[in-house]
Amino acid sequence: MTSSAGQGGGALSTRGGAATKRMKWAVELSLGNSRSRSDRQGKDGDVMYPVGYSDKPVPDTSVQEADRNLVEKRCWDVALGPLKQIPMNLFIMYMSGNTISIFPIMMVCMMAWRPIQALMSMSATFKLLESSSQQWLQGLVYLIGNLLGSALAIYKCQSMGLLPTHSSDWLAFIEPPQRLEIMGGGMVM
């Protein structure tokens, strides 16, 4: 119950027997002291909600679509990871040369070990790709990328002369092949 006050244009509100000064624009939206659900119900038992309120949750499909796109993008990042390493491996292969020393051998070992390790843990990678709709294509791209990395390591081993590709590598009594051309530089004196 409200009554007008003598000064300030405010209103007095009696709530539970105590009078408090209220501003003119204040509106009391609750019924009584308590704010429980039963007090907010009307006399018919209906809940008094504002106009346009609905008890049913509104599904937000834009969030689900954005999540699905994010999962697809993440799965493609995982699948394309080995292919993204190939240009850097080619550059390192070029810079290390074909001589047999500690740096090129370590580089070849790491280049061969990474794809083998990735292929051995492929089941864990496929668990990441299960939520994707293009799971098989992404798995195939992942497999091809790792096989290309292994092929680069094998090629580097062959160019360094570490692979046994001639029969003299296996048998001691066979002479190694002679090189047909020998190139050299410098001035002849």
Swiss-Prot record:
It comes from the Eukaryota. The chain crosses the membrane at residues 73-93, 105-126, 134-154. It is a multi-pass membrane protein. Keywords: Endoplasmic reticulum, Membrane, Transmembrane, Transmembrane helix. It is found in: Endoplasmic reticulum membrane. Its main location: endoplasmic reticulum. Residues 1-72, 127-133 are cytoplasmic. This is ER membrane protein complex subunit 4. It comes from Danio rerio. The lineage of its organism: Eukaryota, Metazoa, Chordata, Craniata, Vertebrata.
